[in-house]
Amino acid sequence: MSLASTSAVPRAATALPPAIYLLSLCSFAFGLCEFIAAGLLSPMARDLHASVAAAGGAIAAYALGAAIGAPVLTAMLARRPTRQVLLATMAVLAAGSVAMAAAPALGALLGVRFVVGLAHGVFMAVASHAATSLVDPSRAGRALSIVWLGLTLALAGGVPLGTWLGAVSSWRAVFAAIGVLALCGGAGLRFAMPAARQEAVAASTLASLRAIVQPPLLLAAGVAALVSVATFSFFTYISPFLLQLSGLDAGWLGAAMLCFGACAIGGNLLGGHCADGARADRSAMLALAALGLNLLGFYMLRAQPLAMLALCGTLGLLFFALVTLSTMRLLGLAQQHCPGSDAVAAGLSIAAFNAGTAAGGALGGVLIVAIGLPSIAIGGALAALLAMLLLWFQSQKLDAPL
């Protein structure tokens, strides 16, 4: 992906470029489009004359598109100017959101969400690379965390707001509003994002595709995937865990989700600062150890409501810190082993987290059936331990001790 022109952007010692915050706004719009479906499943299913289970395919279709689009389409678009790719993905989001609002049947909705998911994967990959290229290396982690903050805010605040709007108006109006937000974000990027001038900076399409299968990048992506497996083998079933095992009521459950969302925002920013202030590998190892202990805490303290609130908060903090740290690790490895493929590396991170989320949900379901609901916390902790072992193995292989 060509980003040579970003060298022309003044790099202030204190403030991040405005384009970083616009990228965050755009990632918020994409995140809202992805996550809002979970809060709108019932009215969508009713309006489209489908079952809730069938309507749940709207979530899977989007995630599948993002997982494919992030590494593969990003590699295929490696030679295109960054601003052009970003604007094209925002146009897809705007048009796709309007198409969702007007969808006459579930099949049409699923198809549109898959296409928008493809654009989502490309946008987050290219935006992640662009953010780190717009600032000095010493602030790359913070810039990346601001871009990803948009997704975190969409999950923590945008989804409850959108669910409420869907209840008082209609789910179609919510998607139409996302389309307007996408247009505003794209218009801002049109003026704030510098135009590319040197196409030779980016790797060729073939070289970018080869980067996807580079062993160092695959190992780092494996760590990222295990982070998601550890988190979502538990978090996917957090509602029955808290309601049935901890004795919390709906009010406490809402408070727990609020703690998760609020701390997730802090975790996103913390991950960026840790990536800038110390080696990302060492910070990731410490965060993984804390994640494993956090999940063990859910198992051991499940009868303590206040402990559950605190642990929900630290789960959000640690997971989103690891999202930023893992992406920075992949970007750093790409610079060492396949220069010019940074955006593809960011896409590989996105695909890994999406795959890990799906695998984590499946693992949790298997554990519940085979052992019981409490076991999901133990399963998550073991996945965190596996991530630590894989990270340690990679550090030894690269002769870069933690």
Whereabouts are the PLM-identified features?
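Helix-breaking motifs and short loop linkers at transmembrane-helix boundaries and internal kinks
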Residues: 49, 81, 102-108, 247, ...
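Cytoplasmic helix-loop-helix junction between adjacent transmembrane helices
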Residues: 112-150
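Conserved MFS/SLC helix-loop-helix module at the cytosolic interface between two early adjacent transmembrane helices
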Residues: 68-106
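A late C-terminal transmembrane helix in Major Facilitator Superfamily
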Residues: 339-370
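Helix-loop-helix hairpin linking two adjacent transmembrane segments in secondary transporters
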Residues: 106-108, 137-194, 237-241, 249
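Paired small-residue
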Residues: 96, 107-116, 306-314
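Helix-to-loop junctions at the C-terminal end of transmembrane segments
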Residues: 69-81, 267-279, 368
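Intracellular juxtamembrane helix-capping segments at the cytosolic ends
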Residues: 123-135, 321-337
